Amino acid sequence: MNHAKQESEVMNLPSTIEVYCVERSLPGLTEKQLADVHWALLRTVERVAKNGGQIRYVRSTFIPDQSRCICIFESSSRELVRTVNETAQIPFTRIENALDFNFLGG
């Protein structure tokens, strides 16, 4: 069994999910504070998934010159993505549906 399938099963993800992009402005954060944001999201997603929520935190990318952070989630709903971010108490500007072409490889 491949790793991706195992991970999806652990995170309660259905076979068809949506990809969501969460955009945030995080001016003045240190690398340590950015790492704390990452870990807060991981812990919150894990807790929500263990309680039956169909969500996975994929990754974040920080753009230092713009103090902008883009976080990618896979989830059964935008509302669940919103709930995770609000529960983690990480401010965000917006949540949008997205396409993730990472599966194409490189």
What is each PLM-predicted segment?
Residues 74-102, 106:
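An amphipathic, aromatic/His-enriched active-site/gating alpha helix that lines ligand/cofactor pockets
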Residues 20-24, 58-85:
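Short, well-ordered beta-strand segments in beta-rich or mixed alpha/beta enzyme
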Residues 45-68, 96:
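Short, glycine- and small/hydrophobic-rich beta-strand elements in well-ordered beta-sheets
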Residues 29-32, 58, 65, 93, ...:
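Surface-exposed loop/turn and secondary-structure junction residues enriched for glycine/proline
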Residues 18, 53, 91:
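Residue-level signal for beta-strand positions within conserved beta-sheet cores that form or flank
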